[in-house]
């Protein structure tokens, strides 16, 4: 495949992903041999497409390719933990987490990764709560504040749940997780007058202002030279990848050996 054809494929893929047409994007992804691509951003997008289609082994293989090409690997390790948890491969998730912690010892998102592993393992609620409480001491974000309140509810810690909901509503005022917190609180007691007013106007905020991902996790996945965002760091290769048949499937093994690396 020449460079023009590859660029056409890449533009089509970008367009489909932007429209969130991940089923259509999958057909494009499977028509290209990505082993010869150096761009971490592009490989990250390919992994996104596989992940959106619940093709976790393929997503993991692409992420391992990206990790092999990365000088830092922090953001890719974060995603490898997430994908391994979705595959219920907790041994590998823990291995990737340990690698992440080694290069991001002071990054608060390590608490989120560890929590996701515990949640996937269905660990006791007390352990999950303890970890999110540690995270909350360092970062107070809507999504995980609500998650903690919900865990309190599941654990039968009603007053802690109510207090956590009140705190979230007070600090963030509006948005998806504020509405969820108000719904959760109303299972146990009525909203305060000011909260009731917020609840009645809950659809007034603009949906496009709602973050699609927790800011701390997003920072790790997409940031630049700080170590979290290798996905946007490199240029496309001068030599373009080969197209493979759409029905040809993907390799069954993960990246291994020099023969699968870009020279």
List where the protein language model places each region.
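Alpha-helical adaptor scaffolds
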Residues: 44-51, 64-68, 72-140
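Residue-level signature for tetratricopeptide repeat
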Residues: 11-15, 49, 83, 117-119, ...
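"A position-specific structural signal for the A-helix of alpha-solenoid helical repeats
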Residues: 11, 45, 79, 113, ...
């Amino acid at each position: 495949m020449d460079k023009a054809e590859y660029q056409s494929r890449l533009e089509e893929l970008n367009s489909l992903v932007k429209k969130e047409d991940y089923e259509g994007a999958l057909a494009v992804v499977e028509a290209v041999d990505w082993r010869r691509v150096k761009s971490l951003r592009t490989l990250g997008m390919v992994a996104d497409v596989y992940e959106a289609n619940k093709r976790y082994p393929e997503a993991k293989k692409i992420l391992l390719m990206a990790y092999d090409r990365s000088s830092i690997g922090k953001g890719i390790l974060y995603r490898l933990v997430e994908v391994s948890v979705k595959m219920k491969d907790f041994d590998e998730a823990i291995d990737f987490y340990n690698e992440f912690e080694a290069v991001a010892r002071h990054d608060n998102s390590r608490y989120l990764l560890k929590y996701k592993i515990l949640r996937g393992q269905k660990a006791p609620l007390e352990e999950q709560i303890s970890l999110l409480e540690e995270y909350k001491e360092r970062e107070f974000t809507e999504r995980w504040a609500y998650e903690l309140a919900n865990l309190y509810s599941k654990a039968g810690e009603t007053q802690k749940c109510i207090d956590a909901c009140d705190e979230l509503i007070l600090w963030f005022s509006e948005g998806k997780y504020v509405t969820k917190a108000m719904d959760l609180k109303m299972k146990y007691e009525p909203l305060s007058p000011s909260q009731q007013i917020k609840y009645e106007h809950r659809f007034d905020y603009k949906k496009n202002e709602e973050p699609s991902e927790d800011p701390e996790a997003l920072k790790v996945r997409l940031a630049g030279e700080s170590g979290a965002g290798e996905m946007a760091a490199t240029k496309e290769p001068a030599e373009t990848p080969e197209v493979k048949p759409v029905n040809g499937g993907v390799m069954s093994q993960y990246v291994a050996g020099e023969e699968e690396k870009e020279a």
